[in-house]
Amino acid sequence: MELYICIHGHFYQPPRENPWLGIVEQQESAAPYHDWNERITAECYAPNTASPILNGDQQVIQTVNNYTKISFNFGPTLLSWMERHRADVYQAILAADQLSGERFSGHGSALAQVYNHMIMPLANSRDKETQAIWGIKDFQKRFARFPEGMWLPEAAVDVETLEILAALGIKFTILAPYQARRVKEIGHGEWRDVSGGRIDPTMAYLCCLPSGRSISLFFYNGLISQDVAFGDLLNNGELFAEKLLSGFSDQRNRPQIVHIATDGETYGHYRRFGDMALAYCLHSIDFNDSVRLTNYGEYLENYPPSHMVEIVENSSWSCAHGVERWRDNCGCHTGMHPGWSQSWRRPLRKAMDWLRDQIDSIYDEEAATYLSDPRETRNNYIEVMLDPSSGRVERFLETDAHRKLASKERERAFKLLEMEKNAMLIYTSCGWFFDDISGIETVQVMRYAAKAMELAEELGGIRLEPEYVRMLKAAPSNLHQNGAKIYELLVKPRQKLPLLAKSRLG
């Protein structure tokens, strides 16, 4: 019987750049580091590129790049920051994907991710499509190959999202066990209810979609993943390995894969020295002849699904109420502020949805005067974001415009695309995840909203801000009255920084 182990790490930080300056400003809560990207890189992303393995005498016997042996995804916006600020770590991650491909039968371990961590079931169809395309194109530019799998933010899923992934050529994604509804053997047998996390997580499943397409799904081992993320498994790498081995069963007379998925930041940021426990665990498994490490692409090629699965629609890995954490006061919170209310989430979502619809309407109307296919151009705009050189910009418009554009028309076309980009960044999931609307993550998505509204006003003199702020008044804060007050205190001053800088420079 063939036994395999796969450890997946979801490595992600939200986009943190000031949308007017294009830089990450100092974040005092990340002290002694400049900002949270810098701090978490020092505590997690960098250590995992060169993690020491210790012997019984606490001597270093080997230093390993953990990314070469695990399955992983990095958020595109995080990699963009890392490429500019920690090129050493960035290059080590890219190299790890190449080395993992050599190790795992030509299957690199890196997965793509939806671009800015938008909760896909709550997005409209055009945003779902663009987010997936941007994630794929970003991945191709960095890893120089097409991704086999794609991570969905918060593992939040619905059938339409799976349809889009399958249509784009994505072979698989990873979900939590309680996101499976029922299973059956392919070709015969009856459907069997596996809701409540009762699915067998030791094999791949085929999800057949209404369009006739299909996509493979892996449902991770929930109990072991929970122990890694919130228990004490990372106190000892050997115990970590033993726990993974306990996931196999002699009752299954077939190949098995025991696989787990957690936030990658668990290995060093949330759990100090977690990278070392991971390194020792992987080292221990490497020297165990009864089992071998694999990644999802390799396993899927060798052992295609024998069973079909239907998902629980609008479900995720981090909200017991489906996807309500990102649009309502469902009861999910960090636990750090007992007694606080998250009743601000619904009004914030309503304000963002209203703004998105206004922005999209402006884009659709004016972009059609310049572009042959405004939606396709938006999907391709990631190419300019990845390479904003003047030559690339010119070629981009030559390809997508339906006539030669004058200088002012080109400028307006790019403003329209930047407006659309910011209107998608407002949906970064962290804006709703935490406990109060005044948190840095929520303020950040409101800054993207302000930038989108600013561009809309520059383009057509349409002032969206008064209505947006009025809607924010309905979002109560546990600290600062309401969302409108927070917008006034924490968003508007940042919007004025570029103007102040310009005036001082003369």
Residue ranges of model-derived segments:
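Short, well-structured secondary-structure segments
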Residues: E2-G9, P14-R126, T130-Q131, F146-L152, ...
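Alpha-helix termination/capping residues and helix-transition junctions
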Residues: V64-N66, A144, A167, G212, ...
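Alpha-helical scaffolding segments of alpha/beta enzyme cores, especially the outer helices
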Residues: T130, W134-K141, E160-E163, A167, ...
